[in-house]
Amino acid sequence: MDKKNIRNFSIIAHIDHGKSTLSDRLIEITETVSKREMKNQLLDSMELERERGITIKLNAVQLKFKRNNQDYTFHLIDTPGHVDFTYEVSRSLAACEAALLVVDATQGVQAQTLSNVYLALENNLEIIPVINKVDLPSADVERVKREIETKIGIDCSDVPLISAKTGLNIDQVLDVIIKKVPSPKNANDNDPLKALIFDSYYDPHKGVVCFIRIFDGKLKVGDEILFMANNVKYIVTEVGIKNPNMQSRAYLEAGEVGYVTASIKTIRDVHVGDTITNANNPCDKPLVGYRKVSSMVYAGLYPVDTADYQNLKVAMEKIVLTDAALEYEYETSNALGFGVRCGFLGLLHMDVIRERIVREYNIPLILLAPSVMYKCYLTDGQELKVDNPANMPERNRIKSMLEPYVKLSISTPDEFIGPIMELCQNFRGEYMELSEIDSSRKVLVYEIPLAEIIYSFFDKLKSVTKGYASLDYELIGYRDSNLVKVDILLNGQKVDALSFISHTQFVYQKAKKIVEKLKTLIPRHLFEIPIQAAVGSKIISRETIKAMRKNVLAKCYGGDVSRKKKLLEQQKEGKKRLKAIGSVQIPQETFSKLLQDDE
């Protein structure tokens, strides 16, 4: 294959600007898939992606195209647009030479557009803008061109103006890919094999399937390969490409993107970002992998049926293989038994993982309230990291507590600036700056505690801006904060799964809200149940669930009043004994309903 005619590129954009639709049109126009097999969101293979209309997983496909009597091979990598899946984007960019930047002609440059551009620049990629949805009545092409030129600094004089939905000017995109996307640099089939794993998944028949970009060398069936991070060796059983179905080939060569299997049954042997080389003729040093991403949000996942715990462990091992950003460890709870504590990149990431476990592995789950990673400095000089409120030390042992802050960039039309500023202040945000995108749109920058935006901030932002604002955030470090742990007590017993950490400014409101909700969610028992919220030994909120009353006088038809008094006293004593030894039954759905109501 002529290396000069290979083009490796990905498509990046803000969520809902038309990446997957453009991918569909490129697949269609190059006749990679027959018209009969063609469907919308072809590369979004997960049912969940189709339902939500978003891309969650990156996906690679090979397209063949002929222009001016030359045969071209395109490797297109479709990427997610949501801020939670930035890690997926960075992985796909490492396997490319260029990125098509799709911008919606009705919305212009959004917060996540800029974030993805910076990722592409970090990877030294050629950025090629494409303006989509030009057929819509509200499209303002000239304004969007100016935005791209001023905010990103790319000349837009010959930018393709397309409609991915109708197929308008899609052939211009193919021309610009041939003209502007560089062919693979220094790709040599005769050098030692050097291939980057940018994605993987587990197949029950083939074992681990690795998606790779070959930078140097050749890879064929029967080769002995070495995974450089773990120093483990395997014999290649199959290599091939996706177009978009898996298609096996005799070999893959430098510059190509494809897949490799080697009957790998040990899931832990494969790491996304690792380098594969030939075991008998290895390369000098591995490729620069990916920077390890840090989890932003932590939450406990527990099976509704404790018998499903082993199945949950298997499910977590397989999902981690396809989602390198997910972290987890096993934990136990007094109230819920065995489960896993997971670290996620954001709330959407958390929601997607939970839904995947329920759908793909048929394990109904209880999701506990999300938390962030706090730092505790103790009086004895120790430093502790706490992502689970139940593990927070006693208050008298804590010298100071730090919480993570994020830099929040909100892109919005002018008329919503006031409501957004008020919203950010209510969530403990600190105003930093206001910059202009154009005459009618601004970018507001705030520094805000991460714990404040992981609950309902995004929904409230959409509400006050009628859905017109977009946001992007990045972690900027830890700051000293006045935080306390709130324990929830039922009948005097702490329920570890309900503990939470709050800033002292909001602790009374939050405690009161949860206690009132629990009163409505927990069914009445034969004895009175006090529900208390406590900070240390101080009770800051209380509600009581009244006892169910059995009418012990029903069988007394008249008769002596002392007989009735005796029966009532016996009932009173029985209830005292029940209260002392009886346990409160918390329905499983209470935990998820508490979380839903918070949102």
Curated annotation (Swiss-Prot):
Entry membrane topology: Peripheral membrane protein
EC number of this enzyme: 3.6.5.n1
Example of a GO MF term: GTP binding
Top-rank taxon: Bacteria
Domain tr-type G: 4-185
HAMAP family: LepA
Protein name: Elongation factor 4
Species lineage: Bacteria, Bacillati, Mycoplasmatota, Mycoplasmoidales, Mycoplasmoidaceae
